[in-house]
């Protein structure tokens, strides 16, 4: 009887230890640190809207984590193989992506925008991109949109949006198609008056925090924290810090 009791106690102790370890696990959070103003490197620190939002969520849930920067095109495969626990990188929620990964509730309403050189008077909207060279970031919604809606002369894909902007700046592309907030931020902060946005924002969709399939418990906790941050004003503070206005 004592032997059975000892075994039972040992098993119970091990179970608690495993449970405690899972609870204390440092989460690995994938991010693409070349997507201003959502996530980018400033000095030796990662900053941005997504970075601040996740820090607030982690504080609310008392989660320990580390950021793992990677190219955007590698994020979904990393989630599928569970090499990371979640990802924030301006990831648009789409039905196609939902087949491969899970998403939190939407946390930012975005869209796509066309950017051209400031002296370009030929391209006034996305309708004028047929027969043009268009630069995009690989693995993003801009690629899908361009393939489905634009008869480009050449659709040039780059792993980093900075390379796409450079392609336009050096006149090797006629336009860039990318996420609205990133284009507007680039024009305002680094464009030096050389670029302009044309036309309306396209394909309004939500960004979501991405998880591997089967992460229901963590996802539900994150959704709860997001709701709390919206209700207590923290979300609005972070939004205003990075976009200069209250969310609509």
Swiss-Prot record:
Q: What is this protein called?
A: Glutamine-binding periplasmic protein
Q: Which UniProt keywords apply?
A: Amino-acid transport, Periplasm, Signal, Transport
In which compartments does the protein localize? Periplasm
Q: Which residues form the signal peptide?
A: 1-22
What does it do? Answer: Involved in a glutamine-transport system GlnHPQ.
One GO location term (cellular component): membrane
Q: Which family does it belong to?
A: Belongs to the bacterial solute-binding protein 3 family.
Entry annotated with the keyword Signal:
yes
Gene3D superfamilies in UniProt: Periplasmic binding protein-like II (3.40.190.10)
The UniProt GO MF terms for this protein read: amino acid binding; glutamine binding; ligand-gated monoatomic ion channel activity
| Chief localization | periplasm
Question: A single GO BP annotation from the record?
Answer: glutamine transport
Q: Sorted alphabetically, which InterPro entries does this protein's record hold?
A: Iontro_rcpt_C, PBP2_GlnH, SBP_3_CS, Solute-binding_3/MltF_N
The induction text for this entry reads: By lack of glutamine.
Key word Signal present: yes
The record's SMART domains line, in alphabetical order, gives: PBPb (SM00062), PBPe (SM00079)
Which PANTHER family is this protein grouped with? GLUTAMINE-BINDING PERIPLASMIC PROTEIN, MEMBRANE-BOUND LYTIC MUREIN TRANSGLYCOSYLASE F
